[in-house]
Structures are given as C-alpha cells and as structure tokens.
C-alpha cells in the first residue's frame, strides 16, 4: 500500500475528532482490503514474541469504542509522538469496530517500528462471528471483507517483552509456557485453538483464591494464582506481567503484590459499566505510571486524570 494512501486513510479516520461521537468513516472496501494485506505482511515480518524498548505506552481492550481510542491518543500523544503497544480486543461489542481496527492497522503500517498490536481473544473468527464484528462487516461491506480481516488477525503476534523485564499478552500465563521460546515457535498464520499455549495466552485469568492452576468460569483455558505469577517471573528473570482481558473499575488493577497488572482502556464499557479506562506509561527506567480516562456523570464526556507512579514489581534499572 502506497504511503500516501495510508496517510489519506489516517487523515479521514482522524477527521471525525471534531464531530459528534459515533460518526462513521466510510472508507472504500478496496482501501480496507489493502490495509489488511499490508498490515499482515508487517506482522509476519516481526516475531511472535515482540522485543520492544521503553519508553512505551501500553493500552488494554478497546472493543470498538472509537471515540475513546481517539481520546487515548489525545491524552498519550498521537503516533509517532509516543510509542504504543496495544494488548488486543480491538473489535466487537462497541459501535465502531471498523473505524477502530482500521486506524490501528493504518498506524501499524505507517509506523511499523513504533506502534505494536498484539492479538486478543476477539481477534478470532469464531468469537467475532458472534459478538458483533461479523455483523458490522456484513452490514457495511460484505462477508468477504470479514474474511480478509480474519486472515490479517491470524498473523497478529501473541506477546511482547519490554526491555527483557515486562512481559505483555492479552490474557495470561499457560501451564504450557515452559520457556519464552515456546511463544516464538507458535506458527503463524493460525486460528486460535480451543486449548494449548496460544489459547491460554489469549484467554487465561489471574485468581487470588487459586493456588497453581484452576478452572476458568469462561469455560476456556485456566485461572492462575499468585504463586504461579511469582514462580514464572523468578524463573524467567522478569519483573512484571502486563495483560488486559478483564474490565477493572479504575482502568488498571494490580495482582500478586504488584507482579501483575490488568489494563482496560474502554471507559464506560458497553455503556453498562462505570469503569475508567487506563493506559500505562513505561519510562526508560521501567517506572510505570497510569493515565486514566475517567467515566463522567454525563455520558459521552470523559475526564482525564493521572495515576500515581508505581514501579514494576521491584524497581529495576534499565538493562
């Protein structure tokens, strides 16, 4: 895809910033198809376990809340002003899955070494077939375009490592995650299997009441306890697990004595929750701080706030 064509797509997607929230951006089907194909090539040119450097801003679930995504960028700085890592779940549930995924893919194509997207459990055909994305593609374009997105999603990387100290994924740990090389060796393109390493990385959840591994109420994957987190970090000489996948009231929530953090970046999720959204800024000393999008009393308006500084696990100088 020509750089000028990508710039044009980004420009039109950002034009709605000053419009009423929810205004659709009508890109041509051919443009979206090219965007998917180009992004797919970029994903495949980079490893399944991304190795990234701080400073970087990390965001959790977006779920088609395009207006909130634009506010996150207004707050954290539009690319390439800041480096970004998103932890998956770009589509489904919210009203603007298409605008959301197109802007994220366009930024990935435009800034391949500064802007990173991981795979969430909703970047999977069997899930987004049910929870909204398929219907949106079918209504606004056609099923063929949905299949093009599926092919693109099947190439998304699973995990990222920030300065060899912070491991990031959408869901969580896996009993099959014996070494980080196991992530590097997951084949792509691939669908998300019902069990196994990739499934767990996208689906598992921490649970303070579990020792080791437990059953997951989602009916998929496992839950893992604080002991599992501690053991994993010690074994791999890591400081922090950063994941998304669960709505948390303040936009971020620590677990296992600050050895794991859950990030969620869709405030007022689905219009049903009163949660804040957060992004985590990791500076070049690996100090983590949180920027908060608070839900406001009046729907559609968001307040900005800033969280206290918090070191990951133990304060670590950058290596």
UniProtKB/Swiss-Prot annotation:
Mn(2+) 1 binds at residues 61, 63, 89. PROSITE patterns: SER_THR_PHOSPHATASE (PS00125). Keywords: Hydrolase, Manganese, Metal-binding, Protein phosphatase. Its cofactor is Mn(2+). GO terms for molecular function: metal ion binding; protein serine/threonine phosphatase activity. It catalyses: O-phospho-L-seryl-[protein] + H2O = L-seryl-[protein] + phosphate; O-phospho-L-threonyl-[protein] + H2O = L-threonyl-[protein] + phosphate. Binds 2 manganese ions per subunit. Pfam families: Metallophos, STPPase_N. It is an enzyme of class 3 (hydrolase). The active site is at residue 122. Its EC number is 3.1.3.16. SUPFAM superfamilies: Metallo-dependent phosphatases (SSF56300). The keyword Disulfide bond does not apply. CDD domains: MPP_PP1_PPKL. InterPro entries: Calcineurin-like_PHP_ApaH (IPR004843), Metallo-depent_PP-like (IPR029052), PP1_catalytic_subunit (IPR050341), Ser/Thr-sp_prot-phosphatase (IPR006186), STPPase_N (IPR031675). One of its GO terms (cellular component) is cytoplasm. Mn(2+) 2 binds at residues 89, 121, 170, 245. Disulfide bonds: none annotated. Belongs to the PPP phosphatase family. PP-1 subfamily. This is Serine/threonine-protein phosphatase PP1 isozyme 2. It comes from Acetabularia peniculus (Green alga).
């Amino acid at each position: 895809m020509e750089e000028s064509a990508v710039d044009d797509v980004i420009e039109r997607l950002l034009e709605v910033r000053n419009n009423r929230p929810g205004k659709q951006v009508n890109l041509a089907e051919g443009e979206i198809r090219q965007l998917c194909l180009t992004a797919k090539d970029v994903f495949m040119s980079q490893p399944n376990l991304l190795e990234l450097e701080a400073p970087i801003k990390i965001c959790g679930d977006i779920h088609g809340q395009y207006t909130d995504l634009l506010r996150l960028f207004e707050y954290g700085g539009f690319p390439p002003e800041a480096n970004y890592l998103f932890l998956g779940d770009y589509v489904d549930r919210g009203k603007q899955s298409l605008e959301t995924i197109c802007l994220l893919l366009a930024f990935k194509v435009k800034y391949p070494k500064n802007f990173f997207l991981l795979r969430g459990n909703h970047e999977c055909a069997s899930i987004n077939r049910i929870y909204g994305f398929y219907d949106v593609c079918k209504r606004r374009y056609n099923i063929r375009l949905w299949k093009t997105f599926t092919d693109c999603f099947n190439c998304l990387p699973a995990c990222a490592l920030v300065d060899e100290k912070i491991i990031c994924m959408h869901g969580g740990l896996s009993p099959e995650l014996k070494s980080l090389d196991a992530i590097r060796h997951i084949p792509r393109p691939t669908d998300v299997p019902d069990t196994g390493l990739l499934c767990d990385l996208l689906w598992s959840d921490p649970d303070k009441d579990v020792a080791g591994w437990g059953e997951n109420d989602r009916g998929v994957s496992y839950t893992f306890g604080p002991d599992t987190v501690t053991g994993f970090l010690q074994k791999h000489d890591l400081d922090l697990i950063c994941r998304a996948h669960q709505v948390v009231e303040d936009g971020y929530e620590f677990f296992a004595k600050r050895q794991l953090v859950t990030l969620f970046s869709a405030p007022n999720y689905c219009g049903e929750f009163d949660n804040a959204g957060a992004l985590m800024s990791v500076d070049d000393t690996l100090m983590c701080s949180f920027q908060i999008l608070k839900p406001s009393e009046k729907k559609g308006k968001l307040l900005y706030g800033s969280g206290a500084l918090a070191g990951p696990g133990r304060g670590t100088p950058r290596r």
